[in-house]
Regions:
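Conserved signature/switch motifs of ABC ATPase nucleotide-binding domains
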Residues: 94, 158, 176, 497, ...
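ABC ATPase NBD coupling module
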Residues: 77-98, 246-251, 363-367, 421-437, ...
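Conserved ABC transporter NBD signature motif
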Residues: 65-79, 412-420
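Short catalytic/signature loops enriched in Gly
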Residues: 2-4, 147-151, 244-347, 358-364, ...
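A short, proline-enriched helix->beta-strand linker immediately N-terminal to the Walker B motif
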Residues: 175-179, 514-518, 534
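A short, surface-exposed alpha-helical micro-motif characterized by mixed small hydrophobic
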Residues: 223-225, 562-564
Length: 618
């Protein structure tokens, strides 16, 4: 049997407009073998997804495949996918080559049950009765680890968790026993525990079914867990292609090195994350090609400085004991006890509860209550960062929005600067609102697409009566853009769609800073960003905190990011804190089993595990 499933040679895909021609994929050559996984890694815009769509010939206008060949093996017969008719290609898509997309909620049809949608794919490609297709769907749900599959096939997408929806997408992709599976960022939107389960599932299915897989991601930590071979893409080009062990032990290209080091690590304490620009710079040549120049990198230039403590940002030991959090490491207690004993907290939360009613019946009677936040107590001191971490649905975002008074609490109190704001009316609260701001998760959805950047940044200034004139507000907007790394008056008249994801998030940060707040709540502020852009934004947030004395509540499901940003950390589960203390202590010596599970689930570059996986497949 031919071992190579797919051979892509010299593939070039372009997008042509009346003004310019953009080369999205440039002379890409890759191959995928049966039972093996090729990891395709790079930033957004590097050409990963366009490569996948080109393989399936799904690139829509104004894009087109300009040159190259795509050879696919079916039953020991090689066919050229670029020359196949549309009717034959439709049989191959879904039947022989299947694809899993990033966001299952938008990929699944909300008006049909999940079981119906999987059955539909089976009936399209296989000669089966509806009853046989239903039984096959139940078997697939069981194979991908969905509990009670005979009941779950009748559930709609919104009735399932994110992890279960992604498992449905995997079941749909596997429904016709494909030879090749293309997984496009299938775990990016998932919590670390669910992500670990999905990676394990995909790895097992690939081996058990002798199926080839292309796994697309921007996270090399995920690549270490699942890939056999790795192709690193940068601006449409493959800049490095090797087996997974070589990528992590002796990578050659500066872009690969930067991706490896941009991720926050669990081991050690660093003040600053390196970025791509620390490793290389690019020059545009006369012929339109890109020349990459490697920089000489030193520990000093990256400022990866080990810290032995965080001085003024530590937590008063006496206050921790009062709150009931006494499980601390002995070597940390002295540092904590000498910090901030006389200082009052900026934010003080006591027994906060937020319960949502579930109504049923024609009279909408309350049948039960969902306890989203169920009695949390904590303090945040000036200049400090508190990290809230946990899985989706644990109550992190509800806690943050309640502190912003975007949601009213069911009970409990929270003080801001010594003043109880938990029971204030909206008119009473208005003078205080400029003292605390929020940065939302999605930089695409949180900016008004109809307003210019100037209007977006100056809007909160006008609302709070700041600035004598429009010129004053415009000047401050310019200063804020420069502060967040977007200098130049030309940015003011642009609209959000003209910016990249990282630039949009910088605009969101500038807007939050517009009213000179004391507290900023960062609600999954970097989870939608690539690791390299994420590093830039995290560094920016730290710089602003140091310069302006800001206080952060940093909400995330990514424990490594929370550890990098936070002085103190609260681990949430089912609306409660299961662990609270200095972030370094929690990582070094977690007391709760749930915290240990979260730490174990973080994608990790373990060289011995990679070697073991390679040896087991020889």
């Amino acid at each position: 049997m031919r071992n190579s499933l797919l051979d892509v040679a010299d593939l070039t895909t372009v997008f042509e407009t009346s003004n310019q021609k953009v080369i999205a994929v440039n002379d890409v050559t890759i191959s995928v073998n049966r039972g093996k996984t090729l990891g395709l890694v790079g930033e957004s815009g590097s050409g990963k997804s366009v490569t996948a769509m080109s393989i399936l010939r799904l690139v829509s206008a104004p894009g087109k495949i300009e040159s190259g060949s795509i050879t696919f093996s079916i039953d020991d017969t090689s066919i050229d996918l670029l020359s196949e008719s549309d009717s034959n290609l439709r049989k191959i898509r879904g039947g022989r080559i299947a694809m899993i997309f990033q966001e299952p909620m938008t990929s699944l049809n909300p008006v049909y049950t999940t079981g119906y949608q999987v059955m539909e794919a089976i009936l399209l490609h296989k000669k089966m009765s509806r009853e046989e297709a239903k039984q096959k769907t139940i078997e697939l749900f069981h194979e991908v680890g969905i509990p009670n599959p005979s009941d779950r096939i009748h559930m709609y997408p919104h009735e399932m968790s994110g992890g279960q929806r992604q498992r449905v997408m995997i079941a749909m992709a596997l429904s016709c026993s494909p030879d090749l599976l293309i997984a496009d960022e299938p775990t990016t939107a998932l919590d670390v525990t669910i992500q670990a389960q999905i990676l394990t599932l995909l790895r097992q299915l690939c081996v058990n079914r002798n199926m080839g897989m292309i796994f697309i991601t921007h996270d090399l930590g995920v690549i270490a867990e699942i890939a056999d071979d790795v192709a690193v893409m940068y601006r449409g080009n493959i800049v490095e292609h090797s087996d997974v062990l070589s990528i992590f032990t002796k990578c050659k290209h500066p872009y690969t090195k930067s991706l490896l080091l941009c991720r926050p690590m669990l081991s050690g304490n660093i003040k600053r994350l390196p970025t791509v620009s620390d490793f290389m710079e690019t020059e545009l040549q006369d012929d339109g090609s890109l020349k990459i120049l490697e920089k000489s990198v030193s520990d000093e230039s990256l400022r990866r400085v080990e810290e032995k403590g965080r001085g003024r940002h530590l937590y008063p030991l006496k206050r921790l004991a009062q709150l009931g959090y006494s499980a601390l490491r002995d070597d940390y207690e002295e540092g904590i006890s000498c910090a901030g004993e006389a200082e009052s907290p900026l934010v003080s939360v006591s027994d906060l509860k937020v319960h949502f009613p579930v109504r049923r019946g024609i009279f909408s009677r309350v049948s039960r209550w969902v306890k989203a936040v169920d009695g949390v107590t904590f303090d945040v001191y000036r200049g400090q960062t508190l990290g809230l971490v946990g899985e989706s649905g644990c109550g992190k975002t509800t806690t943050g929005r309640c502190l912003m008074r975007l949601i009213n609490p069911t009970s409990g109190t929270f003080m801001f600067g010594g003043i109880d704001i938990s029971k204030m009316s909206q008119s009473e609260l208005r003078p205080y609102r400029k003292r605390f701001q929020i940065i939302f998760q999605d930089p695409y959805g949180s900016l008004n697409p109809r307003k210019t950047i100037e209007e977006i940044i100056t809007e909160p200034m006008r609302f709070h009566g700041m600035g004598v004139s429009r010129q004053d507000r415009q000047q401050k907007a310019l200063e804020l853009l420069e502060k967040v790394g977007l200098p130049g008056a030309q940015y003011l008249k642009r609209y959000p769609h003209e910016f990249s994801g990282g630039q949009r998030q910088r605009v969101c940060i500038a807007r939050a800073l517009a009213v000179d707040p004391e507290l900023i709540i960062c609600d999954e502020a970097v989870s939608a960003l690539d690791v390299s852009v994420q590093a830039q934004v995290l560094n920016l947030l730290k710089d602003l905190q140091s310069e302006l004395g800001l206080t952060y509540i940093f909400i995330s499901h990514d424990l490594s990011v929370v550890k990098f940003m936070s002085d103190m950390m609260a681990v949430m589960k089912n609306g409660r804190f299961v662990e609270f203390g200095p972030s370094e202590c929690i990582y070094k010596d977690p007391k709760n089993e749930y915290t240990r599970e979260l730490i174990r689930s973080i994608p990790n570059v373990n060289i011995e595990q990679i070697k073991s996986r390679q040896n087991s497949q020889i």
